[in-house]
Amino acid sequence: MSSHPFADLIGLSTVEQRAGHSRCSLTVEDKHLNPHRVVHGAVIYALADTGMGMALYPTLSDGEICATIEIKINYFKPVTTGPLHCTSDVLNRGRTVANIESRVYVGDTLVAQANGNYAIFKPRATGMAGKP
């Protein structure tokens, strides 16, 4: 995923990506903080969601894409400094749905954990993006 405009926007970096697994990171900057100077939950959510997609992406066949169906996230600790590190693993990959887990850390401290389901499909010819 060398061309990922959203990842570029938030400053997300790929550390490792292979079929069923990914690691990514984000250096905490002022733009990631809420008014209380804590990393906004949406930043952590975006890191987990992107990590899940990165873990699933290499398992896709030509012409297939994936899209988030749902994600459940638990936030364990407030984050004021970083960097944030996310490890994501595909737990189950079926023909049309995959279940993926992300764990987000600051150092060795687990600050959030997410579980998501992703649709796997071939897009229709109109109105949907294809696999890059």
Regions found by a protein language model. Give the residues of each.
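Terminal targeting signals and extreme-terminal segments of soluble enzymes
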Residues: M1-P132
